[in-house]
Amino acid sequence: MSFLYNTTKIRRNITALSALLIFTITANAQSGNLQGFIKTSDGKPAAEVNVQLKEIKKGTISKTDGSFQISNIPEGKYHIILSFVGLQTIQKPVSITSNQTSSYNFKLLENETELTEIVVSANRSINDIPASIGKLPIKPMDLPQAVVTVSETTIKNQQAQRLSDVIKNVNGVYLGTTRASTQESFYARGYSFSSTNMFKNGSRVNSGAMPEVSSLESVEILKGSAAILYGNVAPGGILNMITKKPKFDFGGEVSLRAGSYNLIKPAIDIYGPLSNKIAYRVNGTFESADSYRDQVSSKRYYINPSLLFKLGSRSELIVEGDFLKHEFTPDFGTGTLNDSTKGIRPATIADVPRSRFMGTNWQYNKTYQTTASVTFNHSFNQNWKLNTVLSYQQYKRDYFAVERIQALYDPQPGTWARPLGRVDTKEKYFTGQLNLNGQFKTGKVAHILLAGADADHYITNTYNYDIQGKIYDTINILDPNKFVQRTDIPVANRVTLVETPVNRFGAYVQDLISLTPKIKLLAGVRWSLQESPSNSTTYLQKNDSIAKGKFASASAFSPRVGLLYRYKQNTSFFASYSNSFAVNTGLDIYNNTLPPSIIDQYELGVKNIFCKVRLTVNLTAYKIINNNLAQTAQFDKDGNPNSNSSLKELTGQTSSNGIELDVMANFVKGLSVMAGYSYNDMHYTKTPGNKGSYVKGERLVNTPAHTANGSVFYTFSRGKLNGLKIGASAFYVGKRFGGWNNTIQQSQNYSRLIPVDGFATVDISAGYSINRFSLLAKLSNLTNTYNYYVHENYSINPIPPRQFIATFAYRF
């Protein structure tokens, strides 16, 4: 029986189980529930407020939208206490009725301006706020792993346009490449993120489309290996985008952002109740902009509707969808000069103006991404909860352009014969996951348990084209006036359709065990299976005959164990081990598919909260070792020297070592400070030394040794400056290499590495809010720094120059 059938059966079982739970679980007849919203005096949500029932000492903390819920409360009358550091405590009477959910709304005396960065951004330490990406309600302080959450307030304060703007707030995670400006590729701890490491609301998403930041409530980063939770992911970390959710109180915001290069971006966000059991939210935006690059422009259309259904006192169903259409000019940047004829000089970045565009006046890239998801949450009781997520995603890309700017040194420096590229692809993703978590005790030992399973099914359809004239024309990137450029669109005919299916399945269990009040053990294991059934190729011009590719399958166990010592209430030390696996391409010497590479990670760290939660300092050290990196096989199956580079063996090794420092401070009311520094050393530490293998001791491309970030924002809350906000942020990426890593006995007589200098950028912001109106302005790259994002040796994209943007908003 094929795995595809098994995966389909598993997905059906997960779906059936979710439906069964929705309609068969009944509430406890002897208790009721309490829910509500907490707002500031000017109608904005108050997050992280302590909510407690005085008589039974039972409570919770309000969410980012100001909502709270307490379940399984015995029938009766109580007093609810709302408290927060620095705020006036509120005490109100409430009544609980069996089998019912009582709803109450509360308003704090302070307004949003007075509470800025305290209530909305949360004055609690980053170590006290659980991240949903971990699938368990564990505070980072008790988790032997580094976790970072970027809040909606930070995203708004910095007027983030793209996900790369948000990522600048996470030390050790950085934008590595922007190939043709079509997507953003992030790196962490020496490893590249890909679609396998990118998630939205816990479901894997394609990274080919640049996400819409205005729809995000927060962005979570779980650093290091997350294979036990998500299967085949790169060991550097994973990223989860949390979208805005429906609310049971009416409100919203309309805004208009404008800026340099004709940027115009209106946006709307509206939410409210449809009934006492159904809430909605719709946010959307349109964006139009030119560029600091000549002839480059873009248009984006985005909408994100969602519904929240209360299915009783313990269950809720969230239905979400979003659609993104992004049309823009693909741009391979400045390009390089290459000595491809003599093979004696390394590639160098072309010294041309930042604005010079090397493409045509007709080239285009159109991406369409549609997602839909259903999330079911159920509380059996206060300790046991169930989460089920089913999602569907469709991604389409239509691209036609000249590409890969690799000009020549001679005979005429800068001469480039422009090659054509055509991409026409469509991907469909079906994903499902089921998570059960609970808290219980065995004797005096407390447990927080997670057990779950997930399954993914991907189908990619790719059309290949025959383009009339593989070379479009010839230009000179150093002197555009030397040649007359073509302007017509060449004919491209479809010749084949390749369908590539991928199936993933995983089952996992982990337990956080409190051995003593100070010592906690986190242990778990996951079994993952990834299968690539045979590809099918349809020859569109040869009677539609079909050819099959080669079947491939890989499976692996991913264990995880961590020990945490809570030295004091506000200090914890931890050590952990985990591993992940990487699926390999190519064949072994017996013509079989390669097994996956197993990557081990070791981590040590300390987490501190000082000065009554006003200062948080976290320090982490890690070592990531790939002991079986796929390398070109030294000998063939007969023992003869191997000359076929597609025949490989797991004989290489890479090592990534580093440290990360995170600091967050709120010493003064209205002041928010974040800073971080990371060091990484990633090299090839073992190679077989034969032709085609990598060079021992060489640093991997796109892995800077140093990165750093920092931001400071202050909001005045009293006097004549009340409502004024000022801030600054900075980001640094150190020296790194573009190009390709060198191999033994390569054909080039020079290094294939392209050195790239480090760079730093500084942004400054200022804004003012009064009543429901706000205006915020930002000047980015204040020093007009000039540097590049380098993809291999042909997409050398300059970083943006100094730019100005401003956002005017009205909340209702």
Which residues are covered by each model-predicted region?
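Acidic/polar loop-and-plug regions of large Gram-negative outer-membrane beta-barrel proteins
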Residues: 287, 291, 306-310, 314-379, ...
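Acidic, small-polar-rich N-terminal luminal/periplasmic segments of exported/outer-membrane proteins
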Residues: 44-47, 52-57, 71, 111-249, ...
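Membrane-embedded beta-barrel scaffold of Gram-negative outer-membrane proteins
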Residues: 379-381, 385-391, 395, 399-401, ...
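Periplasm-facing N-terminal accessory domains of Gram-negative outer-membrane beta-barrel systems
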Residues: 3, 25-116
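Gram-negative outer-membrane beta-barrel transporters
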Residues: 649-741, 809-811
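Structural signature of Gram-negative outer-membrane beta-barrels, strongest in the C-terminal barrel
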Residues: 312, 427, 446-450, 454-458, ...
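Outer-membrane beta-barrel translocator/receptor signature
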Residues: 215-217, 228-305, 311-315, 370, ...
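C-terminal beta-signal and adjacent terminal beta-strands/loops
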Residues: 627, 731-748, 767-812
